[in-house]
């Protein structure tokens, strides 16, 4: 067979055979990715991980990378932070780094008690996408989590000026509630709820607001709705426990607090019991025993090393 025949007949025929197979395989593997996410959202973590353990072996590089990043999110929300970070590192070896990777590292560092490292990533995201609202929204969320509410509001408002809406409304709602501006808090949370009525976090924030304004009945309704919308969201149980405590339902408080502590396995940065509602039980032996049993995890406890400079530098797909 001469070279002309190779290019004229053989290669086009091979492409016609291989390309449809590639498209079909990719299609079914993407469906499997979606199935894994659905399984996790329904509470079937083991089935989701079983599906993804097969997809990370895919011969198709893009599918493999997406499987790692999907599994990374599941590990993250399941609080297996070491496995989450390992999968994130695998994903960025297989495809160009993205802005979402920056946020994943940033949030992991914050949760694991490395705020200085987290801030570097959030600021890098602003450098990479200075004209995109999500960059400022995520930076604002960092400031919120570290209690710098004025800076949080400043950056949330910047995000709104760039077109961000629903999630920023939700974030501004809880931020204003934290500083005691309940009127503005309600204004923003109503906007968030109108736009996305099925978001559990909006119901949690509304529950917090109503508890702070002594509308305990409505606070409980929002708390129960948040759990109904997502039983995996451990924050919902902590919030409901706080509502129980506000209404002097100590059995309900301990029941939901124990569910929360069981789901989180350990306490990370930002998960505290400093709300004034805990004054009711801070000297209670049962409460002290529960908190004493709770483990705290930091980044240094993980058996993993990450070269921040290498990750933050270089090209990004933005």
UniProtKB/Swiss-Prot annotation:
Pfam families, per the entry: TPR_12, TPR_8
SUPFAM superfamilies noted in UniProt: HCP-like (SSF81901)
Keyword Nucleotide-binding: no
TPR repeat positions: 65-98, 99-132, 133-166, 167-199
Alphabetized Gene3D superfamilies for the sequence: Tetratricopeptide repeat domain
Entry keyword annotation includes Repeat: yes
Reported function: Transcriptional repressor of the sol locus (adhE/aad, ctfA, ctfB and adc) genes for butanol and acetone formation.
Protein name, per record: Sol locus transcriptional repressor
């Amino acid at each position: 067979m001469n070279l002309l025949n190779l290019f004229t007949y053989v290669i086009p025929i091979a492409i016609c055979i291989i390309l449809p197979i590639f498209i079909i395989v990719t299609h079914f593997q993407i469906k499997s990715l979606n199935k894994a996410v659905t399984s996790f959202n329904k509470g079937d973590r083991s089935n989701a991980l079983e599906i993804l353990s097969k997809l990370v072996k895919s011969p198709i590089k893009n599918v493999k990378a997406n499987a790692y990043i999907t599994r990374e999110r599941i590990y993250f929300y399941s609080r297996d932070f070491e496995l989450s970070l390992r999968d994130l590192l695998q994903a960025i070896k297989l495809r160009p780094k993205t802005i979402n990777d920056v946020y994943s590292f940033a949030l992991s560092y914050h949760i694991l008690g490395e705020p200085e490292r987290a801030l570097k990533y959030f600021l890098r995201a602003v450098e990479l996408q200075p004209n995109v609202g999500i960059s400022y929204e995520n930076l604002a969320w960092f400031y919120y989590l570290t209690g710098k509410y004025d800076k949080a509001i400043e950056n949330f408002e910047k995000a709104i000026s760039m077109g961000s809406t629903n999630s920023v409304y939700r974030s501004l709602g809880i931020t204003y509630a934290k500083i005691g501006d309940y009127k503005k808090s309600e204004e923003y949370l109503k906007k968030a709820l109108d736009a996305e009525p099925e978001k559990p976090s909006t119901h949690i924030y509304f529950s917090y607001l109503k508890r702070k304004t002594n509308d305990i009945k409505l606070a409980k309704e929002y708390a129960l709705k948040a759990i109904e919308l997502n039983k995996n969201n451990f924050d919902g149980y902590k919030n409901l426990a706080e509502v129980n405590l506000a209404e002097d339902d100590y059995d309900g408080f301990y029941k939901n607090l124990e569910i929360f502590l069981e789901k989180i396995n350990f306490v990370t940065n930002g998960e505290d019991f400093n709300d004034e509602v805990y004054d009711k039980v801070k000297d209670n032996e049962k409460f002290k025993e529960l908190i004493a049993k709770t483990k705290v995890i930091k980044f240094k406890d993980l058996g993993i090393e990450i070269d921040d400079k290498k990750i933050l530098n270089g090209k990004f797909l933005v």
